[in-house]
């Protein structure tokens, strides 16, 4: 049976590309945005085909979800129209219902896959009439395999890795308010850098990694506000390489923080005191508030 794969955001692309590789599937692709780089990094050059063609020429479809792009939502709608089975693999642990709504119209898939028991419970609470299937997160399985091969770095590198995400843009797109969750990504990074000496008395290099969907120069303002000799912005290495090269990983609610837990790094949420608590369900994640 021919499978069609559709993705836009990097999070779902990491999961589905790993699934495709692990299952030795050779699908048709309809990709856009950050997903293209993810798939091509892991699989090679992708032959992208139009939305209508991928639905028409596939026996069933597997797609992610996007908070900004309508690509997957339109694929779900078209698959329903053509009576093709459509499965969505959900990434992360928040905003599940909202992912399937555009202009007050909800369009749900035939089946939803989730990668862990936390996500399974959230999905079952949100989608009473959709089949929910638990499949161990293929992306994290790949990470675990790489860690076994590379070895979990325990070298004291005296460096922080700060993983970014477009919180302000997401909040505005979804709720019309950049500070809907009580903070922005700039405020969180500023909160982290302001309190860095409370977290560690040892002087450390701070490596800031922009999110795949963010402009590389988005955080250049930190060089004007803080000691630029101890800070650099870098996304040239892979996420795992940067995590293994650091001893402490900080961020707000990024999936990268979960990867850092697997690598047995100290992980800290940088959400300011006025922000909502970190939604990541992993108890290993600390908070800057714990150090103040």
Language model regions located:
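Active-site and donor-binding regions of nucleotide-sugar-utilizing enzymes
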Residues: 4-145, 165, 251, 256-258
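Generic structural signal for residues in well-ordered beta-strands
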Residues: 27, 132, 206, 230-233
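Short, well-ordered alpha-helix to beta-strand connector turns
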Residues: 57-58, 83, 108-110, 157, ...
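A donor-sugar binding/catalytic signature common to diverse glycosyltransferases
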Residues: 71-74, 88, 235-281
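Short, surface-exposed amphipathic charged segments that create phosphate/polyanion-binding patches used
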Residues: 145-157, 243-253
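Nucleotide-activated donor-binding/catalytic signature segment of Leloir-type glycosyltransferases, i.e.
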Residues: 220-235
């Amino acid at each position: 049976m021919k499978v069609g794969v559709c993705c836009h955001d990097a999070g779902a692309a990491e999961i589905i590309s790993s699934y495709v590789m692990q299952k030795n599937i050779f699908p048709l692709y309809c990709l856009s945005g950050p997903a293209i780089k993810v798939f091509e990094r892991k699989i090679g050059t992708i032959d992208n085909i139009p939305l209508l063609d991928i639905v028409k020429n596939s026996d069933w479809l597997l797609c992610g979800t996007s908070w900004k792009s309508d690509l997957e939502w339109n694929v779900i709608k078209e698959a329903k129209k053509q009576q093709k089975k459509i499965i969505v693999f959900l990434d992360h642990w928040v905003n599940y219902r909202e992912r399937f709504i555009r202009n007050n119209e909800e369009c749900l898939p035939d089946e939803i896959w989730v990668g862990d028991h936390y996500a399974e419970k959230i999905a079952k609470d949100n989608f009473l009439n959709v089949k929910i299937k638990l499949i161990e997160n293929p992306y994290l399985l790949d990470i675990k395999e790489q860690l076994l091969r590379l070895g979990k770095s325990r070298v004291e590198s005296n460096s922080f890795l700060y993983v970014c995400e477009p919180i302000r843009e997401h909040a505005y797109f979804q709720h019309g308010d950049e500070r809907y969750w009580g903070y922005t990504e700039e405020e969180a990074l500023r909160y982290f850098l302001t309190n860095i000496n409370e977290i560690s008395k040892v002087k450390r290099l701070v490596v800031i990694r922009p999110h795949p969907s963010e402009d590389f120069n988005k955080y250049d303002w930190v060089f004007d506000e803080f000691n630029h000799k101890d800070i650099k912005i870098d996304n040239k290495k892979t996420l795992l390489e940067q995590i293994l090269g650091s001893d402490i990983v900080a961020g707000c609610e990024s999936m990268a923080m979960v990867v850092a837990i697997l690598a047995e790094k100290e992980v800290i949420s940088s959400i300011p005191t006025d922000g909502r608590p970190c939604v990541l369900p992993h108890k290993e994640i600390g908070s800057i508030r714990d150090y103040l």
